[in-house]
């Protein structure tokens, strides 16, 4: 890859291996790079250990979503999902285990897939993207068995509430929709942009990030990043972050968020911004926490750069991996 391509590279997605020792990242050129965290974090790490052990073209279009199961890395490109065995990737083999396409309404349509999550209760893969619908695939058989319709524009993000078995979806239409995964029926619809404390009409109404656990939901995008109590369906905290947020996670007593601007924002649940930690890319698309492996417990962020920043404690950048 030449200097011009590197200059215009964006990292859209990342996922840690089941063992927590490797990181996969997807970019706008359809490539997936696999990095060895154990090599990059070792005391005798060199510049070479910050480069991928493997880099391959997985899709024609950008890799907007990556997701790891117990054995495979799932990647989503334009209209298709591919699975790669982690054991084979580590051996530098890049043959896809399988590729599947959701049942789109027209054969001319090749919508991008923006988000994938697993429903651990029934081992279903939940997929959302450019056709405004949620597609559900049985991971055992590889068949798409249901479609959830309700969004009027494309879906950016998905989350799963395990206790209630509920799917949450956020879209360009400004709605967060909550679905019962047992019946595939809609349960609630929250139009975040209609709440005065969250609305930012100058940025639009789209919802680009979503995270949830039992009673709480984090969401943001055009509207301000906000924390919602799902029993009362009301925002309890609105975070005064200037740009649009693209990914947010809750970890212990912190909310960590990335979006426009070269930093990771650390927020407290009450609504205050505690710190903003500088990063290499000028804006960020993806933030991931590696909690599977205590030895390699890191936060990684990627965005409008060929570099992925690695934080060993979440308050400063330890190193940067690069495509």
Curated annotation (Swiss-Prot):
The segments carrying the WD repeats are 6-45, 58-96, 108-147, 150-189, 200-238, 279-321
Tell where it localizes.
Nucleus; Nucleus speckle
Tagged with keyword RNA-binding: yes
What Pfam families does the entry give? WD40
Q: What does the record list as GO biological process?
A: apoptotic process; mRNA export from nucleus; mRNA processing; RNA splicing
- What protein family does this chain belong to? Belongs to the WD repeat THOC6 family.
The entry's protein name is THO complex subunit 6 homolog
> What is the organism of origin for this protein?
Danio rerio (Zebrafish)
Q: Which gene encodes it?
A: thoc6
């Amino acid at each position: 890859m030449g200097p011009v391509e590197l200059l215009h590279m964006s990292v859209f997605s990342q996922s840690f291996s089941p063992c927590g020792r490797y990181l996969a990242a997807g970019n706008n050129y359809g490539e997936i790079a696999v990095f060895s965290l154990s090599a990059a974090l070792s005391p005798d790490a060199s510049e070479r250990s910050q480069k991928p052990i493997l880099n391959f073209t997985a899709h024609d279009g950008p890799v907007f979503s990556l997701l790891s199961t117990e054995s495979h890395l799932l990647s989503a490109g334009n209209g298709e999902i591919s699975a790669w065995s982690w054991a084979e990737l580590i051996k530098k083999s890049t043959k896809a285990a399988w590729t599947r396409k959701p049942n789109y309404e027209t054969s001319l349509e090749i919508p991008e897939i923006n988000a994938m999550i697993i429903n651990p209760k029934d081992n279903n893969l939940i997929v959302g993207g450019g056709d405004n619908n949620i597609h559900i695939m049985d991971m055992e058989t590889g068949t798409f068995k249901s479609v959830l319709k309700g969004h009027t524009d494309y879906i950016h993000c998905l989350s799963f509430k395990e206790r209630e078995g509920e799917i949450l979806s956020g879209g360009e239409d400004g709605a967060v929709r909550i679905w019962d995964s047992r019946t595939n029926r809609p349960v609630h619809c929250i139009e975040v942009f209609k709440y005065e404390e969250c609305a930012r009409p100058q940025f639009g109404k789209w919802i680009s990030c979503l995270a949830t656990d039992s009673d709480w939901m984090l969401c943001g995008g055009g509207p301000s990043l906000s924390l919602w109590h799902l029993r009362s369906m009301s925002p309890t905290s609105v975070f005064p972050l200037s740009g649009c947020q693209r990914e947010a996670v809750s970890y212990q007593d912190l909310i960590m968020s990335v979006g426009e601007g070269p930093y990771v924002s650390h927020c407290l649940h009450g609504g205050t911004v505690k710190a903003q930690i500088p990063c290499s890319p000028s804006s960020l698309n993806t933030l991931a926490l590696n909690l599977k492996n205590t030895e390699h417990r890191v936060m990684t962020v990627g965005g409008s750069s060929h570099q992925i920043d690695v934080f060993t404690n979440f308050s400063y950048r330890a190193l940067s991996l690069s495509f």
